[in-house]
């Protein structure tokens, strides 16, 4: 089949790769001049299938109220006049219950674990390189109450068969030796040994080259205007370079997905949650991380990417903004200086990206009420973690193949 994919982030490119492997003729369209130049460009770098946890969780409303008055809060709420923002926030609040948390986390772990397996298989098949490491993730707790409160997460990990270790201070230092100088800054940690790290931008560009070798065509610098309909199905994509037609269409536009499909009567409650990162060259190996360390207090991930440290995180609900506030940079600097002062922060680059978040933190993967229109979007902070699994899953669904994992609860129908 001829299939057009809208979006060349890590989700769009992995989808293109898996569709091409199944023999389809694939074209990818994007407004940027190359792959992964928006949200996939400088994310935190961790592939954490065992760590996914919904932002909508019991206790989050109270925590969010407290964070409003903190200088280095992990969540920043900047209200706008957009009613979409208020509706999304109300939907998120509705998911802050014990029952919804368990359902949503189980969905997330299912997709993420499958995606990690797909990534490993892809790596074996292609030999792709992207500064990858397979040395686990350490969630670091600065306060005892944080360590004492991981019972629900451990319950879900056990239920889903995800290996984990609860570590004391010495155990944390054993897996991340550079923490020896900061033992007074934390009380313990939760380690997920099967997690990985890697540069999402490098991966996406390398996979795009591989996909081109399989026949995928990329059309960059092309603005997507609208989806055209005829006879109850999608008949084409109106772009700045004319109308593009295909047999099947995939929308993988992250936070911009809702605007494109709204005219079709489809509701995708995906809202941009802004994240920040800095990337610094390593100047002191003894004070740099081995893999990824998650600073629970600031919701920040500190990741080793080759000879660089990537520090990323926070969640800012402020709409489609691209500013780089000094206060956000200060929070990133504070966390990494506290724990891993081995990077040259004076030489660091500062970046922000709009992470496409659903109210239940679960991505939208699957078909729509239009037989030839599919969606792969809304992965929030876990686009890199879930990319390969999401791409392969959707490729199987489009091709009519039996999916490797349950997919019926991942589609847009749960909102419409």
Swiss-Prot record:
One BP annotation, GO: D-alanine catabolic process
Gene Ontology MF term list: D-amino-acid dehydrogenase activity
Residues annotated as binding FAD: 3-17
HAMAP family (UniProt xref): DadA
Name the UniProt record assigns to this protein: D-amino acid dehydrogenase
Function recorded in the entry: Oxidative deamination of D-amino acids.
Domain of life: Bacteria
Pfam families: DAO
Family listed: Belongs to the DadA oxidoreductase family.
Organism lineage string: Bacteria, Pseudomonadati, Pseudomonadota, Alphaproteobacteria, Hyphomicrobiales
Cofactors demanded by this protein: FAD
Catalytic activities: a D-alpha-amino acid + A + H2O = a 2-oxocarboxylate + AH2 + NH4(+)
PANTHER family associated with the record: D-AMINO ACID DEHYDROGENASE, SARCOSINE DEHYDROGENASE-RELATED
Pathway: Amino-acid degradation; D-alanine degradation; NH(3) and pyruvate from D-alanine: step 1/1
């Amino acid at each position: 089949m001829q299939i057009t994919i809208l979006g060349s982030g890590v989700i769009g490119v992995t989808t293109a790769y898996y569709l091409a492997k199944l023999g389809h003729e694939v074209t990818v369209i994007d407004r940027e001049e190359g792959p992964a130049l928006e949200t996939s460009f400088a994310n935190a770098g961790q592939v954490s299938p065992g760590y996914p946890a919904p932002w909508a969780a019991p206790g989050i409303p109270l925590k969010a109220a407290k964070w409003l008055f903190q200088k280095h809060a992990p969540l920043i709420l900047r209200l706008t006049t957009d009613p979409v923002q208020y509706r999304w926030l109300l939907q998120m609040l509705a998911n802050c219950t014990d029952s919804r948390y368990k359902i949503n986390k189980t969905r997330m772990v299912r997709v993420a674990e499958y995606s990690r397996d797909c990534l490993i298989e892809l790596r074996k098949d292609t030999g792709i390189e992207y500064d990858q490491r397979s040395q686990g993730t350490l969630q670091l707790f600065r306060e005892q109450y944080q360590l004492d409160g991981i019972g629900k997460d451990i319950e879900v990990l056990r239920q889903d068969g995800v290996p984990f270790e609860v570590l004391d201070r010495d155990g944390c230092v054993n897996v991340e030796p550079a923490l020896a100088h900061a033992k007074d800054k934390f009380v313990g940690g939760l380690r997920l040994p099967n997690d990985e790290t890697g540069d999402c931008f490098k991966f996406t560009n390398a996979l795009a080259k591989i996909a081109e070798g399989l026949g995928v065509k990329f059309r960059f610098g092309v603005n997507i205007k609208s989806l055209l309909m005829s006879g109850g199905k999608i008949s084409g994509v109106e772009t700045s370079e004319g109308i593009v037609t295909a047999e099947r269409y995939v929308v993988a536009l992250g936070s911009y997905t809702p605007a494109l499909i709204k005219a079709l009567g489809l509701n995708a409650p995906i809202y941009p949650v802004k994240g920040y990162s800095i990337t610094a060259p390593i100047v002191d190996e003894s004070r740099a991380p081995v893999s990824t360390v998650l600073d629970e207090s600031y919701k920040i991930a500190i990741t080793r990417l080759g000879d660089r440290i990537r520090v990323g995180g926070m969640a800012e609900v402020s709409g489609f903004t691209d500013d780089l506030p000094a206060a956000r940079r200060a929070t990133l600097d504070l966390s990494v200086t506290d724990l891993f002062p081995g990077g040259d922060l004076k030489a660091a680059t500062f970046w922000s990206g709009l992470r496409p978040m659903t109210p239940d933190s679960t991505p939208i993967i699957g078909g729509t009420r239009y037989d030839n229109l599919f969606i792969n979007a809304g992965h929030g902070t876990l686009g890199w973690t879930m990319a390969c699994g999401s791409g392969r899953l959707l490729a199987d669904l489009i091709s009519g193949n039996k999916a490797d994992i349950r997919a019926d609860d991942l589609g847009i129908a749960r909102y419409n």
